[in-house]
Design a protein with these regions (language model features):
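Non-heme Fe(II)-dependent double-stranded beta-helix
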Residues: 2-109
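A structural signal for well-ordered alpha-helical segments within the folded catalytic domains
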Residues: 70-74, 121, 181
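Short, structured patches in soluble enzyme cores that scaffold and shape functional sites
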Residues: 93, 113, 125-129, 141
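Short, surface-exposed loop/helix-turn segments at secondary-structure junctions
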Residues: 102-109, 157-171, 222-226
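Acidic, His- and aromatic-enriched active-site or binding-groove loops in soluble protein domains
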Residues: 104-121
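Short, conserved beta-strand element in jelly-roll/cupin
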Residues: 116-132, 179-180, 210-213
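Double-stranded beta-helix
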Residues: 132-193
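Non-heme Fe(II)/2-oxoglutarate
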Residues: 145, 149-155, 185-187, 191-232
Length: 232
């Protein structure tokens, strides 16, 4: 908590987002520009909950600079207790729609834990104002060390948790909803129990920067331009 992007950086990323296509459901064959979202939904025959940008580090100078920012690298290194390696950026919209339950599950709008590596660390930055109803990030403080134990095998299994399960396992004050104006940033070990709320008011634009000890080439957003296709 307590990180804040300069307004100029927020604006730079927002300009990038307005000028480039994003891709529904993070699929390279489902591209559209923001003004064409309704046409893209019509082409898919469903609402679009999440749309991600690809190749952001190479196409957006602000994101490239942030990926090697010395303060972020220092924080990541302190947490990882080693020299951090930048392993990927992700920039995506979450829209206030009546989403399919399968899409809410697919796009991590149910409580869950990430197991991206044996040691990893993430920074998140809101590029839009996020208040209750705008798709805030929710996490459970300290749960990276003590996951819910409700079913046989929960110590090892990675699964989705219902809101009721999380409320039964953790004190209310540990369940934190993170809100703030555009530019608000926070760092998290997403092995903790967390989720993104489904917006009900305004779309949310979020930037994630991830660091680990090694780069296995699986967390980045790079796709060959020749593989990208537009829906609308």
């Amino acid at each position: 908590m307590g990180l804040q992007l300069p307004a100029s950086v927020v604006q730079e990323v927002r300009v990038f987002a307005q000028g480039h296509p994003c891709f529904a459901d993070r699929e390279p064959g489902r591209g559209f520009r923001l003004p064409a979202r309704e046409a893209a939904q019509a082409a898919l025959g469903k609402t679009i909950l999440v749309a991600q940008y690809f190749n952001t580090e190479s196409q957006c100078e602000a994101i490239r600079r942030l990926s090697c920012d010395p303060v972020l690298m220092w924080v990541a290194g302190r947490y990882l207790e080693s020299t951090p390696t930048f392993v990927g950026a992700n920039l995506w919209w979450t829209f206030p729609v009546d989403a399919l339950e399968s899409d809410r599950d697919r796009h991590a709008h149910l409580f869950h834990r990430d197991v991206d590596d044996f040691r990893f660390f993430k920074f998140f930055f809101y590029l839009t104002d996020v208040q209750p109803g705008d798709g805030a990030h929710v996490c459970v403080a300290g749960s990276h060390q003590r996951p819910p134990m409700l079913r046989p095998g929960d110590r090892w299994n990675i699964r989705r948790y219902s809101d009721d399960e999380v409320k039964r396992c953790f004190a209310t004050e540990r369940i934190m909803e993170i809100c703030g104006p555009a530019g608000t940033g926070f760092a998290e070990n997403t092995l903790c129990v967390h989720k993104g709320r489904t917006p009900t008011r305004e779309p949310r634009l979020l930037l994630q920067l991830q660091y680990a000890l090694f780069d296995y080439g699986v967390m980045h957003d790079r796709h060959p331009v020749s593989s990208l296709r537009m829906l609308a």
